[in-house]
């Protein structure tokens, strides 16, 4: 008798995606982040659902409803902090996942890569609208500053901003619609993730060497299921250490002050995972230029397949490209640090230099280095 998992219409899909999926035999722990992102998404949807049961999206009661969750709801504090820190974990995994794709040339799977970039934008949008919901000082002013950036769009900018606000400032209408967006977007992310997987399974996974691995495949279960479980346990350990010992480590103290439109915080900054993009935005003195640089800092990922000049797919055997890649990572970390600093003398110039080098490395130095490496190998 044929196994039910191979014949049943629903179980067949699961089987082909997670059990009998032929996987390369040499994929490293950098390939764990896809499953970790899935776990993060499920965790965020579940904790978010329980938070939504007690949260009220009204300017008068939003802040106190979050306080009520932490003080009065059974285990509300742990749900709230798992959701807040789970978002940080989500982004750490996302950046690792994208970095892996850049390093090993996974961007040559065009559909998978482009849907991944759309996913990144969607997750960033979700995190932004979610950060507004507790209605603290940083929530309010973050929403005001970031939505205001759209006013830099010529001709339609001001109308667009007022349309998003639902009035002439960030107010009740804005909070209500942001809650609606924050509730629906994770389900759109889940649907996009399925499409992402669908396209990935059309081609099969890449591997560290970048060489086709059709001749050496192993079943996903049990080899990679057990490996993913280990990754999940480590992620859970790290998340729970954060939640139970330092829940506010990555948050902003200003968000424990209720939103006050009459009092601007001395230093408005987004969550830690957006600081690199925020630093690029601030490093350009012109408003429209800053907004374009902000969008391009992420959208540049779409150009990666076009900028690939090497005759090898992966960076595994390309030491010069490896050096450039890690310099790029160092620049992103520098930008993250600068984004959290006040706009003062040494930080301004460091931010501008790091921003210029970020674009320079991706657009010029990496393609040129790849060409040089081709010539060194006499290709």
Swiss-Prot record:
Record-listed heme b b566 binding positions:
97, 196
Keywords noted in UniProt: Electron transport, Heme, Iron, Membrane, Metal-binding, Mitochondrion, Mitochondrion inner membrane, Respiratory chain, Transmembrane, Transmembrane helix, Transport, Ubiquinone
Details of cofactor binding: Binds 2 heme b groups non-covalently.
InterPro entries in UniProt: Cyt_b/b6_C, Cyt_b/b6_C_sf, Cyt_b/b6_N, Cytb/b6-like_sf, Cytochrome_b, Cytochrome_b_C_euk/bac, Cytochrome_b_N_euk/bac, Di-haem_cyt_TM
Q: Report any Pfam family annotated for this entry.
A: Cytochrome_B
Q: Where found, per UniProt?
A: Mitochondrion inner membrane
- The residues that the entry says bind a ubiquinone are 201
Cofactor(s) the record lists: heme b
> Which GO biological-process labels does this protein carry?
mitochondrial electron transport, ubiquinol to cytochrome c
Membrane topology value: Multi-pass membrane protein
Q: Which residues of the sequence carry a binding annotation for heme b b562?
A: 83, 182
Q: Which domain of life is it from?
A: Eukaryota
- One Gene Ontology cellular component: mitochondrial inner membrane
Similarity field: Belongs to the cytochrome b family.
Q: How does it assemble?
A: The cytochrome bc1 complex contains 11 subunits: 3 respiratory subunits (MT-CYB, CYC1 and UQCRFS1), 2 core proteins (UQCRC1 and UQCRC2) and 6 low-molecular weight proteins (UQCRH/QCR6, UQCRB/QCR7, UQCRQ/QCR8, UQCR10/QCR9, UQCR11/QCR10 and a cleavage product of UQCRFS1). This cytochrome bc1 complex then forms a dimer.
Which PANTHER family does this UniProt record tie to the protein? CYTOCHROME B (PTHR19271:SF16)
Q: What else is known?
A: Heme 1 (or BL or b562) is low-potential and absorbs at about 562 nm, and heme 2 (or BH or b566) is high-potential and absorbs at about 566 nm.
Role of this protein? Component of the ubiquinol-cytochrome c reductase complex (complex III or cytochrome b-c1 complex) that is part of the mitochondrial respiratory chain. The b-c1 complex mediates electron transfer from ubiquinol to cytochrome c. Contributes to the generation of a proton gradient across the mitochondrial membrane that is then used for ATP synthesis.
Name of protein: Cytochrome b
